[in-house]
Each structure stands twice: as structure tokens, then as C-alpha cells.
């Protein structure tokens, strides 16, 4: 992928520009939220912090409302981005999908294999194999934004496209590997609601209200069905009509995406980060850091991501299946591959799904994610800053 598609219309270009800007700024806010959570969790306020998260409201803990409710809005945003990019954006043609597609596949496979190798023989911890397989688009773009305008737009678009495809892979993994104890009547109700949403799309209903009301109903049914509730957000997004290029001024999808971006970037994701990054470091020793879970997560993110993304990209380019992003070189591409190891939001999210009955393992996941993502952010920014300072 070398540039934004020529098929993309002016409003689509504006949406992409705002997307990159808000995701970058949102990533910085997310960093602050994560740091604040770490400080609070290791201060005199820690008891209040964890007490609030575990307090129950309307049958669910505050933590579950955030992870199952607010994150459904995040996944709605992810679904809207995927649909826009595939229909009229940077993933509109197979040629544009090739490089981020191969890179995303490699960047999911290698980290998972590293985690599996380190946790082999332990069925309980092996279920966390998907934790290091995701890239946090907000965090990664936020770190990349620290270099300012020195970074070619093509590299930013490549990273955004890769992370979007990465999210699509993560959604698929959650659907197939982290859903259990299915409630068939509720699942049938969810499919019936989804069928109505699809019918609205086919009938070219362009008012958002019916979609949003049915989407809320879909979320409830999916929550009760045993399938993870956040998938309702993705399903709803795929049903909201994009419209033809000449109708983009009235596109429900673009309108909703524009309205949601800042709320997701500056509220939903930081709240999730603050609620999930807090881990008490008391009692954690160097010996704990080499336990299979934190070691597998940290090495999967920091080592596995850069190897998987860069190797897959090199093979695709050398085979003539893709081209190097415009105005970039191999070292810069490698720097971006390192940044793909920032897996904060989705990695923490999958960690909660992988170990629902063990706070100890969830805390180990948090430590591994913080170390792996931190190393990836530092190494990536140092390499890219050194490289760009020479030009």
C-alpha cells in the first residue's frame, strides 16, 4: 500500500485525516490513563480503586460494564473503520490490502507461536495464546505522532491499515476461541435481530436511529448468549450503510464514525485503559517476570511482533505481491514493525477473556503487556527518531 486510494472521496480523505489525528492524540491520552492507573493501584488509593471496579450496578460489576459495555462501542468504531477502509479507503483494492494484510497475518502468527512455545505443557496458561497477537492502533499511532511530520503519511496509513486488519483478526479469534456456555434461545434472538439489521441495510434505510436501537437490543442478546458482547458492536457496524461515493454527504456510516471518533479516542479507550492497567506491583520480583505468562506476553509483543510483521512484509514485497510504502525505506518499515508490538488495549481485553477465574494470571498478563508494549514503544521510537534525524 503506497497511498490513500484515488477512489477515496474528499470527505473520505477528511475522515481519514481526522482519524489519524484523533487516534494519535487519543494514544497519548491512553498512555496517561495507563500511567495514572499504575500510580493509583500502587498508592494509598488502591483499595478504593479496586473496590469501585468490583462494585455491582444493575447486575454487573463496574469493570464488566466497561469491558462488555463501553468496549462494545469501541468495537462498533473498529467495525465502522474496517468497513470504510474496505469499501472506499486504504483497503479498497487487493493491491492495497496486500502489504498490511500479509504483515498483520505474520504479526499475529509469530507472537502466538512464541507464547505457545513458552507456555507449552500448561493447559491453564496456554489459553492466553492470543494475548500478544494484537496491535493497539491508538497507542501505536500516538507514539508515532511524537516524531511529528517527519513520518511519511504512507507509513502512518500502513500502520493504521495493519492495526485495523489486526483488530479484525482479534475479533475473529474472540468469536471462535473465547465464547463458551452458549445460551441457544438468546443466540437465536441475537441472530433474529441481526437479520432485521441486515434487512434494514438491504432496504436502504439510512436513518441511524433504527440501527442504534436494534444494536442495543443485539448487544443485550449477545451478552446473554455466551458469545462475547463486544462482537455485537462489530456486527452492528457492518450493517450500517456506507452509501455510494456520490452519496457520501449523506453517508450514515461516515456520519456516525465522525461523531464517535473523539468520544472513543478520548473517553472510551482511556476509561478502559484506566480500569484495566492498574496492577499492584507489591510482591512482584524479577523471578515473577520470567513466569511463563508475563514472559510469553512480553516476548510475543516485543520480539514476535517485529519479526512477524517485518518478515511477512519483506517476503510479500520480494515476491512482488506488495510494494514498500511510498517515501519510506526498509529501516523505517522495520521501526513501524517494532511499534506494532504495542498491544495494550486489545491484549488486556483478551487477557481478561483468557483467564476469567484467575486474578493472579490477569495481573501477570498486565505486567507482560506493560513490559512488552513499553519496550516496543521505546525501541521503535528510538530507531525511527535516529533514522528520521538523518534525513
Swiss-Prot record:
Family: Belongs to the NhaA Na(+)/H(+) (TC 2.A.33) antiporter family.
Topology in the lipid bilayer: Multi-pass membrane protein
Keyword terms: Antiport, Cell inner membrane, Cell membrane, Ion transport, Membrane, Sodium, Sodium transport, Transmembrane, Transmembrane helix, Transport
Protein name (Swiss-Prot/TrEMBL): Na(+)/H(+) antiporter NhaA 1
Taxonomy, superkingdom: Bacteria
Gene Ontology BP term (one): regulation of pH
Reactions accelerated catalytically: Na(+)(in) + 2 H(+)(out) = Na(+)(out) + 2 H(+)(in)
Main location: membrane
GO cellular component: plasma membrane
Transferase is among the record's keywords: no
Organism: Pseudomonas savastanoi pv. phaseolicola (strain 1448A / Race 6)
Functional note: Na(+)/H(+) antiporter that extrudes sodium in exchange for external protons.
Transmembrane portions of the chain: 19-39, 56-76, 98-118, 128-148, 157-177, 180-200, 208-228, 264-284, 297-317, 335-355, 364-384
Molecular functions (GO terms): sodium:proton antiporter activity
InterPro entries referenced in this protein's UniProt entry, alphabetically: Na/H_antiporter_dom_sf (IPR023171), NhaA (IPR004670)
Pfam families to which the protein is assigned, alphabetical: Na_H_antiport_1
Compartment(s) of residence: Cell inner membrane
